[in-house]
Amino acid sequence: MAKANSRVKKKAKQVVTDAVAHVHATFNNTIVTITDRQGNALCWATSGGSGFRGSRKSTPFAAQVAAERAGQMATEYGVKNMDVMVKGPGPGRDSAVRGLNSVGFKITSISDVTPIPHNGCRPPKKRRV
């Protein structure tokens, strides 16, 4: 017996005016995640997913492009104001914030949330080239 065709309702996108942009900048990649105030992810973009591969993935320009892509997706949710939380030592820290600013958001605060150990794990040995 075949199941009757029932319409699947598409989930309506919520309207969020205030959001938080989490920029995770590593030495190899930059991940930009935009969440609401409660921490629920709205959209995200990476410099690797923006078409950059290899060593070009870790450039400031790739981080700026990733931030602009995430910002374009966030405008579909009606985001106007944004807090930016930057984590990590990567080269795309500042340019990702500039990319979010160029989309047209009103950036209310920029905070550095890089985790700093209080003498925790032993760091990796120094590179010898």
Curated annotation (Swiss-Prot):
Transmembrane regions listed in the UniProt entry: none
PANTHER family assigned to the protein according to its UniProt record, in alphabetical order: 40S RIBOSOMAL PROTEIN S14/30S RIBOSOMAL PROTEIN S11
HAMAP family per record: Ribosomal_uS11 (MF_01310)
Pfam families: Ribosomal_S11
Upper classification of the organism: Bacteria, Pseudomonadati, Pseudomonadota, Gammaproteobacteria, Thiotrichales
Gene name tied to this protein: rpsK
Subunit structure, as described in the record: Part of the 30S ribosomal subunit. Interacts with proteins S7 and S18. Binds to IF-3.
Single GO biological process annotation from the record: translation
UniProt name for this protein: Small ribosomal subunit protein uS11
Cited InterPro entries: Ribosomal_uS11, Ribosomal_uS11_bac-type, Ribosomal_uS11_CS, Ribosomal_uS11_sf
Domain of life: Bacteria
Coiled coil start-end: none
Family to which the UniProt record says this protein belongs: Belongs to the universal ribosomal protein uS11 family.
Function of the molecule: Located on the platform of the 30S subunit, it bridges several disparate RNA helices of the 16S rRNA. Forms part of the Shine-Dalgarno cleft in the 70S ribosome.
Keywords from the named record: Ribonucleoprotein, Ribosomal protein, RNA-binding, rRNA-binding
GO molecular function, one term: rRNA binding
A single Gene Ontology CC term: ribosome
